Amino acid sequence: LNNIITIWQRDSLKSNTISGNRLHPHLKNYNISEKINFTSNLDDLDFDTLTIIAVPSSAISDVLSKCSLRDGKYIIVSKGFDINTGLLSSDLLESNFNIKDDALAILSGPNHAEEIIIGKASAAVIASKNLDYAKELQKLFSSDVFRVYTSPDVIGVQIGAAVKNVIAIASGLCVGLELGDNAQAALVSRGMNEIMSLDTAYSINVRTLYGLSGLGDLI
C-alpha cells in the first residue's frame, strides 16, 4: 500500500529514536518501514483521512482536546472506559468531540502486536453503525494471515473488550497464586457468566460477548 502513515508519540525522545533506528523498544526484532513517519507534534497529524486512536482509553479525552479534529474517519483500538465520565470511547467521541457515528469504528480482538508483525495468524472484529465503513476497513486491514470480521454492535464489542480485562487479571492471579486449573476454569466460566448479564443493561447482542472482543480476547 502507498498510504502515508504518521504515528504520534508524546515522548519526543522516543519518537526521534524510533524514527532514527526504525526499531520499537518493545518490538526490537522488527524493522519498521521507512514509509512510516513518527512525530511528537500533534499538529503534524492529518485528521482529514483515517485516524487510528490507540492511546490508553484514560488519555483519549486529554489528547483529542489538543487536536484540531476534522470531518475525517476514525477507528478506535483502545479498550476501556473514560476515567472521568465513565463513557465508552465511541460515546466520548460522539458527545464531546462531535464525531459522527457513521464515521466511527472500533477494532478489537485477541491481537498481540509481536505475533501480528511476524505473520502469525490472527483475527479481529471491526464494529461500526455504518456497515459500509466497516467493510471498507475490513478490506484495508485484511491479509492472508489477519482475518477481519465486521459487526454493527459497537457497544457490545467495546463492553466485551473492556470488562473481560477484570476476569483476565483475576485469571492471572490464579496462575500466580498457584490455585490450580480447577479454580482458574471456574473463575473464567463464572466471570463470563457475569459478563453475559450486561447484555440487557447495555442492550447489546449476547453473541458479541462470545466473539473475538469478549471471550476470544479473554482466552
Sequence positions of predicted segments:
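Cofactor-binding loop segments of dinucleotide-utilizing enzymes, especially the Rossmann-like FAD-
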Residues: 10, 79, 129
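Rossmann-like NAD(P)(H) cofactor-binding subdomain of soluble oxidoreductases
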Residues: 32-35, 39-121, 137
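Conserved SAM-binding loop
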Residues: 7, 52-53, 126
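Alpha-helix C-terminal capping/helix-to-coil transition sites in glycosyltransferase folds
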Residues: 44-48, 163, 215
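C-terminal substrate-binding/catalytic lobe of Rossmann-fold NAD(P)-dependent oxidoreductases
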Residues: 203-219
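Internal alpha-helical scaffold of NAD(P)-dependent oxidoreductase catalytic cores
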Residues: 96-104, 121-169, 173-208
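Conserved N-terminal Rossmann-fold NAD(P) cofactor-binding segment
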Residues: 3-49, 61
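Short phosphate-binding/catalytic loops that engage adenosine nucleotides
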Residues: 3, 72, 146
